[in-house]
Structure formats: structure tokens, C-alpha cells
């Protein structure tokens, strides 16, 4: 049975952790879905892991739409959520509605995710939710603000920062967000936010106290040349793929394939 937004809230109430991974194409989406992941996020991290951009900032809405369409074609079970890319929603709530509507209508995703909190993004979330667009929030380290943060630094380390992030999360829930990603913040802060909100929190580099956990699939599978300190590689596909390709090339050169 397909995972729904309502199911995520039920799982939070039951204390059942939520698994989330990123996807950017049909083959990976199919495999991850068949393996039983709860949520697939078509994350703007695909800018780096699939398209070779240095940050998420160059990714366009058209590129995101292309990848979201590929992902939804491979999914039968997981809830598919898609990031709104940089500058596709910050200008106005109306711009955000057009961008989100494109992804829901043309790619078939169930919801969108946007970065930031109070006050502007909370207003945008409210605007979208009022018009039937389910929205996931994202606070803490928001990668689209990488230059403003002077890198991918941990957020919420001071009392002032921690209170700001907490208030942003509260505002996003009040605006109608159905869940919130908490990225690269201290574990006690993430736990406090999780206990304060009635909607699910999904952590990445935020400790074990969240309602669920998300990893970039390329990091989880050992495909990334570099991965953040809070990621965990469950295998080393980079090594496996390199070895397989080298073996194929060697077989061809020595007339071992085909036989």
C-alpha cells in the first residue's frame, strides 16, 4: 500500500521511525522503492550527485521536473516529495504556487519541500497549503543558503540561533507544513523541536531524537567522493563499480569477453 502524508503523522504518534532517501532517476527510484523505503525525496542535492554542479544553486525547475518525472515512474509504494529549487519560490508565494503546481501536475509528486522559516517562508507555506499543495519545511542548515552561511556549517549552536530555529519550526507547523527536515543542528535542539511539534521531524545530522532520518542516497551507498561527517555509508558502490568496469575492460582487451 502506498505511503501517505496522513501515514507519516500516524507513525509519529506511534513512535515508528520514518525512513527517507533521495532519488534522482528511474533505476534508483525503483530499487529504493522495492527495498521498502518510506519516503523518496527528489532532493536538489541531485545538482551535485547527478549533474556535477558545485552546489545546489544552479539547478533549474526544468531540470528538477525532468528528474522528478523519472523518479515517479519507478515508484509504487514510497511517498515522493520534491524540492523546490533555488529561486523557484523565493520571489513570491505566487511564484512558489506556479513552481509547486508544475511539479505536482507534470511529475506526479505528492508534495514539495522548501527551505527556510519565519516569516517569509511560513507565509509561502500557508499560501500553498491553502491552495491544496502539501508542503514539507526545512530548517537548520539550508543548503540553498550556503553562501550566506559561509559554507555547510552546523547551525543552532548558540542560544539565539537555537531559539530562532525552534521558532521557525513552530511557525512552519502553524502555517500548515506536514513535516519538517532538521539539518545539521545539535541533537538536543532537534529533540526539543521534535517533542514540541505535532508533525513529524526528519533529521539529517540532527541526532537520533527525530521522528525519521534522511540520507543522500549517493552518500549512503558510498558513491560520493566526499560526504558530510554525519552521513553513513552502508556499502562502497564506488569501489564495486570501479572494480567491475576495470574487469570488463580487462576481459575485452584480453579477448575474454565475449566467449
Swiss-Prot record:
Homodecamer; pentamer of dimers. GO terms for biological process: pantothenate biosynthetic process. It holds the Pfam family Pantoate_transf. This is 3-methyl-2-oxobutanoate hydroxymethyltransferase. Its EC number is 2.1.2.11. Binds 1 Mg(2+) ion per subunit. It comes from Acaryochloris marina (strain MBIC 11017). It is an enzyme of class 2 (transferase).
Amino acid at each position: 500500500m502506498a505511503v501517505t502524508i496522513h501515514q507519516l503523522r500516524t507513525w509519529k504518534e506511534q513512535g515508528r521511525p520514518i525512513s527517507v532517501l533521495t532519488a534522482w532517476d528511474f533505476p534508483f527510484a525503483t530499487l529504493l522503492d522495492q527495498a521498502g523505503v518510506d519516503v523518496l525525496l527528489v532532493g536538489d542535492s541531485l545538482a551535485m550527485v547527478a549533474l556535477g554542479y558545485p552546489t545546489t544553486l544552479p539547478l533549474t525547475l526544468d531540470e528538477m521536473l525532468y528528474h522528478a518525472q523519472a523518479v515517479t515512474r519507478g515508484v509504487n509504494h514510497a511517498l515522493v516529495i520534491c524540492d523546490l529549487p533555488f529561486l523557484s519560490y523565493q520571489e513570491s508565494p505566487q511564484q512558489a504556487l506556479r513552481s509547486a503546481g508544475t511539479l505536482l501536475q507534470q511529475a506526479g509528486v505528492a508534495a514539495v519541500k522548501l527551505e527556510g522559516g519565519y516569516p517569509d517562508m511560513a507565509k509561502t507555506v500557508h499560501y500553498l497549503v491553502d491552495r491544496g499543495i502539501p508542503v514539507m519545511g526545512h530548517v537548520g542548515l539550508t543548503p540553498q543558503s550556503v553562501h550566506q552561511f559561509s559554507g555547510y556549517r552546523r547551525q543552532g549552536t548558540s542560544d539565539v540561533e537555537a531559539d530562532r530555529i525552534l521558532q521557525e519550526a513552530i511557525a512552519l507547523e502553524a502555517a500548515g507544513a506536514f513535516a519538517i527536515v532538521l539539518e545539521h543542528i545539535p541533537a538536543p535542539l532537534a529533540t526539543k523541536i521534535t517533542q514540541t511539534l505535532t508533525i513529524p521531524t526528519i533529521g539529517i545530522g540532527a541526532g537520533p531524537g527525530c521522528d525519521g532520518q534522511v540520507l543522500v542516497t549517493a552518500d549512503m551507498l558510498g558513491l560520493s567522493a566526499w560526504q558530510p561527517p554525519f552521513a553513513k555509508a552502508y556499502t562502497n558502490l564506488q569501489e564495486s563499480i570501479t572494480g567491475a568496469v576495470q574487469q570488463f575492460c580487462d576481459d575485452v582487451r584480453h579477448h575474454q569477453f565475449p566467449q
